[in-house]
């Protein structure tokens, strides 16, 4: 769903690897390539999904041995005690070796002062990346400006993370398609009034740092299912159509966040007799 520009960037990365492998097999000169990447974008734009896909592609190309994806963040890498942060980084690196390590909100490692243990985590990470360059791929993810600051936090990061893939926010149309696809998979059909309200809901959401993208579409869908259940439970012997149809009454008003546990709405609906 969406991600056209991201798919193009992923193809560029993987095609380069494939051609370099072909050149090596034919004893042609090859250009050393850093496989580590920076992913920038708001939450819910598919960064983890693409990281998982890349891990599988890297394994199929023989870039990594196992192709597992290990996810972590500052809390998984930094300890509040002297000497423990490096050990935590090494422990996570051990789990990820042979696959891909995804560091979410990696910029948080660089936010403290000179004495912050996040700096120790970055220094250790740079050494791990160098020592395990043939066995580990690292993807650092976060907001664009913050990730720029992260790369600038250590002289060794810019050369090891030369490529950035930007994940744009989903359009209103793409968010509607995500909502509709979730409904199709779960056995729910939005009627025209529900579709119109869902589209209006997405159009009203501010595109700021808190914008949840695909997660927002999922939250709105799950909220609609909860609201529909509260509405349908009041119907005596509901029909299959009533059980599977989402109406405008089941969609949160534009500008209002999704919520669960709503009170059943009064209804005079009855199955056709």
Language-model features: locations:
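The conserved phosphate-sensing helix
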Residues: 4-7, 206-233
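Conserved C-terminal "switch" segment of AAA+ ATPases
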Residues: 61-66, 146-152, 158, 167-211, ...
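Conserved catalytic/switch belt of AAA+ P-loop NTPases
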Residues: 107-139, 143-158
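C-terminal engagement/docking regions of AAA+ P-loop ATPases
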Residues: 4, 229-273
